[in-house]
């Protein structure tokens, strides 16, 4: 109960971590069978200090799918449906983390986002 109270408190106080910004970058289009590589640049917070750094995507029609994360300690967790094609890595010196999705098809058509 104390943990939940603390989490609620942290989310309820305006301004906490409000300067954290995540910005995606990468190619706008990738041809079928190629690999998609995206970068997420984080400012205002060190990716090694805490949190899970996620990739999600939104398909046409607005359906969201969580793809996976890399945690502050470098460990990964992936959506089982993507496990054979996805890799999420990081460069702590640049405070960036990366998505690589192999063998893309038209079913991977989506808008890709990074999030914490």
Curated annotation (Swiss-Prot):
Alphabetized SUPFAM superfamilies for the sequence: Immunoglobulin (SSF48726)
Signal sequence residues: 1-18
The protein, known as: Ig heavy chain V region 3-6
Domain of life: Eukaryota
GO cellular component: extracellular region; immunoglobulin complex; plasma membrane
Alphabetized PROSITE patterns for the sequence: IG_LIKE (PS50835)
The keyword Disulfide bond is assigned to this record: yes
Disulfide bonds: 40-114
InterPro entries on file: Ig-like_dom (IPR007110), Ig-like_dom_sf (IPR036179), Ig-like_fold (IPR013783), Ig_V-set (IPR013106), IgHV (IPR050199)
Complementarity-determining-1 as annotated region, ranges: 49-53
Gene (name only): Ighv3-6
Gene Ontology annotations of biological process type: adaptive immune response
Alphabetized UniProt keyword annotations: Adaptive immunity, Disulfide bond, Immunity, Immunoglobulin, Signal
Entries under Gene3D superfamilies matching the protein: Immunoglobulins (2.60.40.10)
Region feature (Framework-3): 85-116
Region described as Framework-2: 54-67
Annotated region described as Complementarity-determining-2, given as residue ranges: 68-84
Start and end residues of each stretch annotated as Framework-1: 19-48
């Amino acid at each position: 109960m104390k943990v939940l109270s603390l989490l609620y408190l942290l989310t309820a106080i305006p301004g906490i971590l409000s300067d954290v910004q995540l910005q995606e970058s990468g190619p706008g289009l990738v041809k079928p069978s190629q690999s998609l590589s995206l970068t997420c640049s984080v400012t205002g917070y060190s990716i090694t200090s805490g949190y899970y750094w996620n990739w999600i995507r939104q398909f046409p029609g607005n359906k969201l799918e969580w793809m996976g994360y890399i945690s502050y300690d470098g460990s990964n967790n992936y959506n089982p449906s993507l496990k054979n094609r996805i890799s999420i890595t990081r460069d702590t010196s640049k405070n960036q983390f990366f998505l690589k999705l192999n063998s893309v098809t038209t079913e991977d058509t989506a808008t890709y986002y990074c999030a914490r």
